[in-house]
Amino acid sequence: MDRLDYYIEKQYGNDPKWFEEEIIQGSHAQRISNVIANRDYLSGRHKVLLRQDSQYKGKTLVVNKTVINYAKTVIKFHNTFLLGHPTALSCNDEHTLNTFNDIYKLGQYATVDYEIIDRVNKFGDAYEVVYIDNGVIKSKVLDSACSYPVYDELGEYLAFIEHWTDVFTSITYWNVYYPTYVEHWSNEGADEHLVSTTMAIGLPIHYHNFSDEDYNYGVSMLTDIKPILDELEDIMSKLGDAIYVNTLNPLPVAVGQRIESSIPADATG
């Protein structure tokens, strides 16, 4: 019995649909949640946008919400710093070198390399599937929010699950990667069933940077950047409120006036 069979037997009692339980484990849920949160942040949905507007005498005072998209610039700088120049391969055997250069060009691996480093910087992890299409070696970088690598308690990489739900049809799909083959599952027609099985040349390649919390996974650059930018956005927003409300457009308040409701914490002035 190999380690994967032992893992499935020990954790899931040899259930052929073991992958359904694997993807809802707490460690996976937390990691996917972080990926989605980082994706939302890079899309412009920042914490500062949650600042509440304040009310005064039946009128709404719209508080300032300053968004700084500097995180994108930082990540792009790191991507360009590492892959700003074309990758150059070297080998003592000229024939081997030419072969690998042809593979690199035909498979458009310059783009693949950039996608990998970009997702590692954004999400901490990236996953590459290598396959052959009409005799050409190619690679596909998987969506980090749909990727579930399977490790055992010793940190050995055993399997990989790609899972997503189509937003238009609400059909859920699972691509379960084993070392030598891939099972394609779907719940189209209400019940989960095996659609097809294809050959594979190995598990998806898992790229990640180093993390002191978990050696099997990486950590996003945004983990360190977001708290700083959130604080900066909050300060600049409140500073803008203080300038426009206190200096340019002050609100008159009578001393001793009865306040019938609490003042929002985000109100400045």
Spans of model-derived segments:
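Charged, low-complexity, helix/coiled-coil-prone segments
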Residues: 42-47, 55-65, 172, 234-252
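Extended, helix-rich architectural segments
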Residues: 1-137
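Extended, charged amphipathic alpha-helical segments
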Residues: 195-269
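Intrinsic disorder/low-complexity segments enriched in polar/small residues
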Residues: 10, 21-23, 31, 184, ...
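Extended, regular secondary-structure scaffolds
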Residues: 117-218
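Residue-level detector of alpha-helical transmembrane segments in integral membrane proteins
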Residues: 8-9, 79, 142, 197, ...
